[in-house]
Amino acid sequence: MALDIKLLDIIACPVCKGKLHYNKAVHELVCRFDKLAYPLEEGIPVLLENRARPLSSDELSS
């Protein structure tokens, strides 16, 4: 199930409250400021800090 792009206008990073970006290739919401990627489960964002994975420097540069 795909993410409803309209959600990106109303949701924010739970850590810094900043804007999230959708990485369609891996179905994750990315916070570049905190260097975290939040998973999507069946199209639903899981915005829990303990479920986020840290982004590598390679991922941040792309």
Curated annotation (Swiss-Prot):
Pfam family, one: Trm112p
Superkingdom of this protein's organism: Bacteria
Gene3D superfamilies the UniProt entry points to: 2.20.25.10
One Gene Ontology cellular component: cytosol
Recorded family membership: Belongs to the UPF0434 family.
PANTHER family linked: PROTEIN PREY, MITOCHONDRIAL (PTHR33505:SF4), ZGC:162634 (PTHR33505)
Protein name in UniProt: UPF0434 protein AHA_2776
